[in-house]
Amino acid sequence: MAKDLNVFDNEYGLLINGVWTKPGALLDSYNPANGEVLAKFTDATDADVDAAVAAAQEAFKTWRKTTTTERAAILNKIADVIDENLELFALQETLDNGKPIRETRAADIPLASDHFRYFASVIRGEEGTATQLDSEDLSIVLREPIGVVGQIIPWNFPFLMAAWKIAPALAAGCTIVIHPSSSTSLSLLSFAQKINHLLPKGVLNIITGRGSKSGEYMLHHKGFNKLAFTGSTEIGRHIGIAAAEMLIPATLELGGKSANIFFDDMPFDKALEGAQKGILFNQGQVCCAGSRIFVQEGIYDKFVNALAEEFKKIKVGLPWEDDTQMGSQVNAGQLETILKYVKIGEQEGCRIITGGKKIEGALGKGEFVEPTLIEAGSNNARVAQEEIFGPVATVIKFKTEEEVIKMANDSEYGLGGAVWSTDINRCLRVSNALETGRVWVNCYNRLPAGAPFGGYKTSGIGRETHKMMLAAYTQVKNIYISTREEREGFY
């Protein structure tokens, strides 16, 4: 039986102060797998942003005073809504983004639910400190919510990244104005429709539209006390500068060119799957994708040949079909970027082992590309240094542990990476030597709540998915008490 794909409203307004506005100027949201329009959404104006910020400021006056018990209860109710609507949200995310439904059903949506439950749990355990400095002086340290936060989320994981941003901010007592990518706004809008009744008006506000318009206006709005962004390093740098100019903090989770390192003694079959998961998950549109595959010389030919055969067997298909393993890129622009880099690799003398072409035929109306493996003669090749953001991995041979560490660290990025070996001492040595914020050992792309995620170098500032995020959405207050009854005698 054909799956019903009519799961969106025709038009979406903005969520401001608990009310859905009447749609104004509209933009189209497309299904990247077939080019069809899914729905229309609002292209917000400066006045819309002003109204959303004002609503968040007003709501903060009371939301900040709610107890951790009250906020935890709401977060758990939000998680319940996600669980109850898993199939709907999974299909909506798949249609809007192009990723296969087996991923949204098993990863994106359940992980989002878990993030709300995680922060509902850890907020109950947060405590201040009190220190008796001496016989007369007591220092009390408290953390208070930072205020109104402006959050901008990317198109590669719109639902999950919204959870990464919203859950800790609400838990900390902040109010929110959040802006999804104009390429993938629909799943967040649908989610907000389902949870709006759970939140006091103005606590969560959603602005949609062009990043160059409403997104840019948000960056310089003086009503924000913090900015948070997930996306490219180029835009992240721009946002960091905007935050610095306003003297407010920013959390930035940015790009990567992660090293997936395979030693001769790797667990072979598991490693084959790990190489695929590192670069084919979400069509390679993952900031921490294992796009540089380093293989030790003793196993190189066997592993690369086997990996190429696995790439050829991947079922690329319509993302809403249950047996599809890899879906569509998010839009035509991203597909063009991928194909451009394949050509750059060829011009640099790299060998295309498999893939590298747009898929035509029955999938010709969509933005589909073959899983691609490129043998790079050098780690200095552009395809080994620049973020492609697609299912394209470069393969590089290495001899020694020292050599691969040097090559892995020879990158402007430092977001993710992995080590594959049955020697735990080697795994720990290499993990400690890698200049990256997340190192997986004998696994890849595991992203649970409770494990801090973020980058070194130009891969960002701050962390996500851990209770330390509560510190990022709060500020420290010190209450200093003198119990001495007499004058100090200083004057």
Language-model region placement:
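Long amphipathic alpha-helix in the N-terminal Rossmann-like dinucleotide-binding domain
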Residues: A54, A73-E87, I101-E126
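Residue-level signal for inorganic ion chemistry
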Residues: G35, R71, E93, F116, ...
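N-terminal alpha-helical segment of soluble enzymes
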Residues: P32-N97, G298, E310
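Short, well-ordered beta-strand elements within core beta-sheets of diverse protein domains
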Residues: V37-A44, E58-K65, Q151, N260-F263, ...
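Conserved C-terminal structural/oligomerization subdomain of aldehyde/semialdehyde dehydrogenase
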Residues: N34-K40, I261, K315, Q347, ...
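ALDH superfamily catalytic-core signature
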Residues: E234-S378, V441, E488-F490
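Hydrophobic face of amphipathic alpha-helices that form TPR/SEL1-like repeat modules
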Residues: M1-P32
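Rossmann-like NAD(P) dinucleotide-binding subdomain of oxidoreductase/dehydrogenase enzymes
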Residues: G128-K270, F398
